[in-house]
Amino acid sequence: MIAYIFLALFTIAAVIFIVNSHYRWTYFFAITLFTFLFGGMLMVSSQWQRALNFSSVLFVVLMLFHRLKIHYYKQPLLISDFFLVVDWRNWETLIHYKGALFGVIGLLALLGYAIFGFNDVESLGVLGNSIGALLFIVSFSLMWHYSKNPSAVQVWLDSLPDDGRDVFLNLPMSCRGIFFKVPNFDGNSQNFIEKMTALSSDANNLSETKPDIVVTLMESTLNPHQFAFSQQSIPPLSMFEPQNDTVFASPLRVHTFAGATWKSEFAFLAGVPSTDFGALASGVFYSVVPHLQSGLVKNLKAQGYFCVALSPFTKGNYNAKSAYDHFGFDLMLQPQDLGYPAPISKNLWDISSEEMMKYTRMILEKQHPALENVDQPMFVYVLTMREHGPYELGMENTFNLQMPNLGAKSISALNDYTQRIVALNDAIEGINNYLHERKKPFVLGYFGDHQVAFDNAIPPKKGDYAQPDYVTQFVVRSNCASQFKQEQKFLDLAFAGGVLMNVAGLSAEDEFMKANMAMCKLSDGKLEDSSDIQLLNNYRHYLYQTLAIAR
């Protein structure tokens, strides 16, 4: 009797989810998805109660999983997220978010109940199997056919800025996205080519000496002075302020919030945003990178650079090593490879940024067997981790932070965050001083990969930007004698690699990088922020349809 009460409750919950859909197309896809799940279990088990229980409970699981992702990542659940879920190398992340860990454990328990509940009820025999197979095939065919309907596609795409709130629309519609296909943009490549060729050449900026290039992806980093505090006593942070060696500094458009660092890595290394790939955006390190034909690292290698990635996470985490290999890196190292006292299989969540800079110095000094015979200029790409959450919720208000409508726990989290950024500032200034002391040409770049929430609160920021929660900062410093002059006041992360090459006095080595640098000039550093939508579409058409940078 209790089991049937639960069955009724879960079924009612599933019906409520369907009734509360926000779009007409969601009703269709929610009903067909429910029928698909029901038919699949009925086809296998021939037990109608088990099939109803499976589909109803799974609807609840999917809705809760969707809300869990929005809670932590402020992004909707898409089918490509399951690339990350099924890769066990990523599971350690849950240990650092106890709320998420308990939530996932609860969802797994519900999933087990969905699969095994009512497994001892009477079978309908071959008739049940046949009806289930018919429902399964028909519902799948309907979802597959209508997932490419222009009206359905437009409704779905329009819903994504609102957190993609209808998960039962997101999942069927994003299923086609798990199969890689070249992005298709309506535009005119020839128009872009004409604008690109009309630009003046920067041949005078080219350097005969190729400097070492160090780039730091600063985890979860936004200059805390950008928060709109009514009162604060945060010390000056020199890494964000103009210095004698600062050659470029601007706000930076990133394409993720509160996590998914690999999306920012992708934009920087590939030179195109993950958003170009639609539903595959969450899985670009798995499903898109192998198809790329160009990018920053391949251009640097063509210039003779030896390229090294240094990560505090394991080589398998988020498929990093495989992705870096495809990008063109010669070597990926972890701090453990350079003497850090921890097993090579351990993700270093608490390693300080100062220690990461120490190992960066060791790479530049070639203190690793794989580097001993390297006589090329070096590109070192390093990721920090200490700035990552979670943050202390009981810390004193050390920096006297005040902001209306922000709770005590959020203020505590912001204090913890700020002290980590202060330590990061010391680490960045330390590596910058070291690079100067070497008396060799260098270019040092650093950028924040995304913003974060503080006890689930998102503090308002200074500045008048579209999507202000997706803006960090990018800074380049150098001792190179160069004629480089900053032209952009705002930069998309996809253009950061080209800016670094320009500062270093390096020419583009392929047509993609030439186009990337040209578009940066033509659009004043903007992509999705550009007011010239036709120029943007012409550029994208040139990249994907003419140059075929992804195949």
From Swiss-Prot:
Pfam families: Sulfatase
The UniProt record lists the keyword Transferase: no
Compartment list: Cell membrane
InterPro entries on file: Alkaline_phosphatase_core_sf (IPR017850), OpgB/LTA_synthase_biosynth (IPR050448), Sulfatase_N (IPR000917)
Gene Ontology biological process: lipopolysaccharide core region biosynthetic process
Top-level lineage group: Bacteria
Keyword Nucleus belongs to the record: no
Keywords: Cell membrane, Membrane, Transmembrane, Transmembrane helix
PANTHER family: LIPOTEICHOIC ACID SYNTHASE, PHOSPHOGLYCEROL TRANSFERASE I
Protein's UniProt name: Uncharacterized protein HI_0275
